[in-house]
Amino acid sequence: MAEGTSQRPLTPLSQAFLSTNTLSPASSPLTFHSEAASLRRKRSNFFPKLDELNGAQDEEMRGLNIPGGSGYLENRYGRDKFTFSDAAVNSAGMGGSGIFSHNNADDGLGDGSSTVLPSSLKQMLDPEISTANNPSAKPRRTRLQTAWKEATNSAGLSLRSASALDVLKNSGPATTSLLSSTTYPFDSLNAFNEPSHSHVPNSASSTALSRGMSNSVTLTAPPEPDEETIPTAIVIKNIPFSLKKEVLFKVFTALDIPRPYAFNYHFDNGVFRGLAFANFHSPEEAKTVVQVLNGYEITGRRLRVEWKRQLPPAERERVERGKQEKRAVEERKNQLKSPFSVANIGAGIDFDLNDPAILNVYSHILLFYYRSDNTNDLVFDSSTTQEERRVAALLASRLNLNHSVTGDGEAKQVVITMPSTHFTPANNSSANHSPLMAPNASTLNPSSLGASNLSQPSLANHLSSSGLFDNGLFSSGGLSSNFSSLRRPAPSMHLADSIRSLRGLNDSKAFSDIRSMPATPLELATPFANLNVSSPLDRNATNSSNTLNGSAMNDYFASLTPSNTGAIGSRTFTKN
């Protein structure tokens, strides 16, 4: 190795350490380079402001007037020993006359020792914080730290010095972005200057409070909820306009504070004005959030959290009345928009055709409408229940049948009669009457007639040969075209003429989806030869040969008896 390269010059830090302790250059294991002054001049381009620490004689010649020897470093660094308390430092430390031993120094805090850190150590961790216990001590920052801070600031980063709490809890890096106030909104609070804060917080709310705002900013405590406020509702003000609701809601999770079950932004004519409402399950949760979020800084704006105030009784009643009126208007709109069908026969009618009892009443009324005898009325006497009589009256009104209520109390009965004028099958129109039970020729098949082994032509031949159709209207030649006229179509359950004119003819298909209807003569499984079906044109005729005498219909009408009124040609409803 070349001569002069085996010795390395002492760095400024090494010289500072040696000058403040008992070690001397003679006893030091490090040898001094003879050309230290020239090397310092070469390094002056890299560390021009650190040359004053070397105390060379050539610096005095340049007019810096820096005293040489160890007295300069003693005066410069010796005063740090006054900032360390005797309880925290066991040796003389830097600037002291005693011998410093690494073996005697404690690496950590012992059991039962206080977590109050020395003020000088807190200054080293956070030079921006001034010491409250020693007003004469000012925050000092070395030139190297200043150079680092200037470099990081020019690069777009902010150098955040670790606080005492960060050292104890080992929380996160020291360098953050320019929006560090969003992640660490309370970095500057010196929470450990007071003895009352000597303990380490263990809850989220106390952690957020301990990392509070700087001492230069003082916020008043949020008011306690009173009788005019809602204890479980808060109002968050001064929210940044560009901050989304989802991002603000994540702040609750980041701070580990209770999250609201209802959280909404308030928009003024569609524009967000920095106001939000939050509701909580208990007053304790709301109080915790108010204490933590009040003064929380987000992108340079401090939130203001207050309790939500109740409206005056008169104003509250006016708002509630407006809500009820709006709800009533919406219900009326929905009723007008809803189509007329079996599910909603009427807005005030609450019966279900799937109910067996109601379906039985409906079947008897429908068979009464399709009667083949001279029965003029159908009576629902006192043997029926009140609900059945009510349903019978409602169904009769929907079927355009006349009904009347006679008697009082237990003897009350509902009498249903045919209207004075009703249509004739010859003038039948699908626009005015719903073909409830009248299938056309295309939908009538042998399987629906109970004769699965007969095709439609053979069925027509069988009906024509059995003498069922003696009228010229139902001749064998026009059987297929007039096949849908065998039965009288059911009346339509339509609304009044004034309302029906607005809806058009859509109600003609209102009850076309009903399949649970009683059997008719053509749908019985009995042999067709035993039936004697009359023409609907001769319904009012008195000829007894035109009546239905099928076995199934005879079984049905055999159980009918005259009504209590004694009128001839009436029948009474009986339960099956």
From Swiss-Prot:
Domain RRM span(s) in chain numbering: 232-310
InterPro entries cross-referenced by the UniProt entry: Nucleotide-bd_a/b_plait_sf, PIN4-like_RRM, R3H_Cip2, R3H_dom, R3H_dom_sf, RBD_domain_sf, RRM_dom, RRT5_SRSF_SR
Domain of life of the source: Eukaryota
A cellular-component GO term for this protein: post-mRNA release spliceosomal complex
GO molecular function per UniProt: mRNA binding
Family matches, as SUPFAM superfamilies: RNA-binding domain, RBD
Role noted for this protein: Regulates global gene expression after oxidative stress. Interacts and stabilizes mRNAs and may regulate their transition between different cytoplasmic components after oxidative stress.
PANTHER family: RNA RECOGNITION MOTIF RRM DOMAIN CONTAINING PROTEIN, RNA-BINDING PROTEIN PIN4
Subunit: Interacts with csx1.
Name under which the protein is recorded: RNA-binding post-transcriptional regulator cip2
Species in which this protein is naturally found: Schizosaccharomyces pombe (strain 972 / ATCC 24843) (Fission yeast)
Gene it is expressed from: cip2
